[in-house]
Amino acid sequence: MFDNLSDKLDKAFHILKGHGKITDVNVADTLKEVRRALLDADVNFKIAKDFTTRVRDKAIGENVLTTLQPGQLMVKIVKDELTELMGGETAGVNLSGNPTVILMSGLQGSGKTTFSGKLANYLKTKKNKKPLLVACDIYRPAAINQLHVVGGQIGVEVYSEEGNRNPVEIAQNAIKHAKANGFNVVIVDTAGRLAVDEEMMNEIANVHKAIQPQETLFVVDSMTGQDAVNTAKAFNDRLNFDGVVLTKLDGDTRGGAAITIKSVVDKPIKFVGTGEKMEAIDVFHPSRMAERILGMGDVVSLVERAQEQYDEEEARKLQKKIAKNEFGFDDFLTQIQQVKKMGNMKDLVGMIPGAGKALKDVEIEDDAFKHIEAIIYSMTPGERSKPTVLDAKRKNRIAKGSGTSVQQVNQLLKQFDQMSKMMKMMQGGAGKNLMRMMGGMKGMQG
């Protein structure tokens, strides 16, 4: 995520390395590279220019008051200014109303229908809501089918009316259905277009007027950069939406849309999509995003994701197994599956401070655990619980059954052995304290 921008900003800050203090000259040299990095990231020229002017003024002004090294001071100021540029504070979704009505809008291909499903899943699993998805795209039967498939995946009902060509009527009927059947959130997925046009604007304006949603979200593909920003501006001028959703952020190496959209439309980014899975949705935190752009990672989000997968009862069972030296491949597999639920691997690595930079040339596949799972699934229950029985003949059978090599099987056994030893060591105070801390923090979240 934003790898190109992160690299270029890092090189810009390098100019100040070895300098004892900030001067007009070294600030100008650094900010010239910062501005170039922002322009390469598809940030609007005026926004990039204004941004570097604010950073320069702060750097010169704060220099006499700080004990920070010039490079550290510049990183701090750029982080603070990036945070402000992207909205400053985290903006939550408005869940007032009974039911809460959320109107989804956006261009065709922006990921609007998929995100509608992700939002429904988020509200169901994280906010304890009972959402209803509504199919109002009367032009593309495939969009209605897609929403039904998405609803089936997450266990959320989808309301649609076959043969009805009036999206206003469909939306109004869906809200009546929601009230009659105990749904407390209605997510209305509207028709997308290939470009912003008058017909599309009129239609969604009519739907908006008829159902008076508590929240209107505009979904944009972050990988389209300035096009996304321009589209959002044209749409907001007509509809005056409440917030922006940036999809496909995991594939965006530049970051122009995320950085500039708030200052152009003066509406907050509320959510981001970071993968194809229904769980790949994050509330947008400007300060955390600024830290990730600057290669500082995002430990808070990483811990939050880990806590969501943390099961105190399972942790106790695992602790007992480790104490009795009964940790087996079934337990190892459970740990892998919990990590997978946290999100795609590249995104997780990017949350670890310094890891994104250190591993920038390493290809991190989303199915990084595929071979490990195949090897474990090719073992018998007895072999999984007692790996010491695995001789050459058994390893050969497992390799053939999993489509891997004996070398890969041996490599996994070595990793498993190392992990078992590490977990045994963690049975001491440090490990128990860590488990207690995770449980305590999860309790604090409620």
Q: Where are the language model's segments positioned?
A:
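Generic secondary-structure signature for well-ordered alpha-helical cores
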Residues: D40, D57-I60, T83, G87, ...
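Long amphipathic alpha-helical segments used for membrane anchoring, targeting, substrate engagement
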Residues: F2-H19, R288-G446
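Short, surface-exposed connector motifs at secondary-structure boundaries
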Residues: K126-L132, I154-V158, N184-V186, I211-T216, ...
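Conserved phosphate-handling catalytic cores of large alpha/beta enzymes
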Residues: A171-I175, K179, F183, A195, ...
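Primarily NTPase-proximal linker/entry elements flanking Walker-type ATP/GTP-binding cores
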Residues: L9-C136, A143-N164, I170-T190
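Residue-level signature of catalytic and energy-coupling elements of molecular machines
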Residues: L16, D42, V78, L107, ...
